[in-house]
Amino acid sequence: MDRLGSFSNDPSDKPPCRGCSSYLMEPYIKCAECGPPPFFLCLQCFTRGFEYKKHQSDHTYEIMTSDFPVLDPSWTAQEEMALLEAVMDCGFGNWQDVANQMCTKTKEECEKHYMKHFINNPLFASTLLNLKQAEAAKTADTAIPFHSADDPPRPAFDSLLSRDMAGYMPARADFIEEFDNYAEWDLRDIDFVEDDSDILHALKMAVVDIYHSRLKERQRRKKIIRDHGLVNLRKFRLMERRYPKEVQDLYETMRRFARIVGPVEHDKFIESHALEFELRREIKRLQEYRTAGITNFCSARTYDHLKKTREEERLKRTMLSEVLQYIQDSSACQQWLRRQADIDSGLSPSVLMASNSGRRSAPPLNLTGLPGTEKLNEKEKELCQVVRLVPGAYLEYKSALLNECHKQGGLRLAQARALIKIDVNKTRKIYDFLIREGYITKA
């Protein structure tokens, strides 16, 4: 450890030569018999046979150099120390600048070596960096490898999602263009000098105070965006769509007051009104049962089934008004009757239109190169191809349905359709797939 600890790219970090007091440059000599403190000599003093007090020129010695591997055969000890110093200077994750400072390794090599030996190998890290914690590190958990986060997302520059996020840069937690982006222009020509009059000095100070107030407004807006989670606009809209239409209208109205209260209080207010709406709807349903003389839920299920049957029969009875429109035209009347007969036989109107028009069904969607494809398994890829849904949208819909199912303890198809407002047939296929694969459960 002493040997490794003496290696550094900065000569001033090493002890000076005992002969000429110059900074030591590798390789240099360490006397094996003198010390402590250690007795170091540069090559010039060693070749002259320098002697000092108890040190004699015939003492045994060691050649101090860092040109040997420690952890990896392709990495020398000097490169190991240079890597640690570069990470300390440039910051973890800034591998391009780390590689530029080292000059001998690429950024991929630096990242791979550092993650392998200093992040994912806690036993070695504790042994090398802190011997006192070696015993405790034997029972320590394995370090978690670094993975980039998906929330907020990191879209490509100038993409549609990047424009939706107003140019937000997640790595810097800042925007490309600030609110009131040209506020600094008012200060570019201001210069405080001793010859300024009192009025001119007060005027300049007033401009600075105005600039400070504009900075405070900029920070206030940033805080509102971050606290309320408004950066990821798509996720925010999905969360809003899980409410019924009446609650969505309230959500839209109360959005302007979100800046006054905190995010937790605002969410509690909306959730409480959503719960109130559900309770009112449930009370109305129970009152309908009581009016009909129903006193148990078993009878209520029979009542709902019969009510649905009556509604369907009522809709069928209105067909008489439709056929009366064609009573004067016999050919049109026969065509309408044939269409109704096909519908009664089990064919949907969409199938009839497709068969009449002769149109072909849309081909499966090609997922090659689409973002998010690598996150899908084979069954999910097949679903996206058949439904013609891009992987990114499918992952957002899946996450929204999973969260709602976990929150409610189950999910109905009607709730899924209210949550993801796309084609109802696509929603049904996604819902059936998630049920079949065990991702969600029916309510």
Swiss-Prot record:
Keywords: Chromosome, DNA-binding, Isopeptide bond, Metal-binding, Nucleus, Phosphoprotein, Transcription, Transcription regulation, Ubl conjugation, Zinc, Zinc-finger. Residues 70-122 form the SANT domain. Zn(2+) 2 binds at C31, C34, H55, H59. A zinc finger (ZZ-type) spans 12-69. Zn(2+) 1 binds at C17, C20, C42, C45. GO terms for cellular component: ATAC complex; mitotic spindle; nucleus; SAGA complex; SAGA-type complex. Residues 356-443 form the SWIRM domain. One of its GO terms (molecular function) is chromatin binding. SUPFAM superfamilies: Homeodomain-like, RING/U-box. Its main location: nucleus. GO terms for biological process: chromatin organization; chromatin remodeling; mitotic cell cycle; regulation of cell cycle; regulation of cell division; regulation of DNA-templated transcription; regulation of embryonic development; regulation of protein stability. CDD domains: SANT (cd00167), ZZ_ADA2 (cd02335). Pfam families: Myb_DNA-binding, SWIRM, TADA2A-like_3rd, ZZ_ADA2. The modification Phosphoserine is found at S6. It is found in: Nucleus; Chromosome. Residues 426-435 bind DNA. There is a cross-link at K132, K138 (Glycyl lysine isopeptide (Lys-Gly) (interchain with G-Cter in SUMO2)). Interacts with GCN5 and NR3C1. Associated with the P/CAF protein in the PCAF complex. Component of the PCAF complex, at least composed of TADA2L/ADA2, TADA3L/ADA3, TAF5L/PAF65-beta, TAF6L/PAF65-alpha, TAF10/TAFII30, TAF12/TAFII20, TAF9/TAFII31 and TRRAP. Component of the ADA2A-containing complex (ATAC), composed of KAT14, KAT2A, TADA2L, TADA3L, ZZ3, MBIP, WDR5, YEATS2, CCDC101 and DR1. Interacts with CCDC134. PANTHER family: TRANSCRIPTIONAL ADAPTER 2-ALPHA (PTHR12374:SF20), TRANSCRIPTIONAL ADAPTOR 2 ADA2 -RELATED (PTHR12374). Component of the ATAC complex, a complex with histone acetyltransferase activity on histones H3 and H4. Required for the function of some acidic activation domains, which activate transcription from a distant site. Binds double-stranded DNA. Binds dinucleosomes, probably at the linker region between neighboring nucleosomes. Plays a role in chromatin remodeling. May promote TP53/p53 'Lys-321' acetylation, leading to reduced TP53 stability and transcriptional activity. May also promote XRCC6 acetylation thus facilitating cell apoptosis in response to DNA damage. This is Transcriptional adapter 2-alpha.
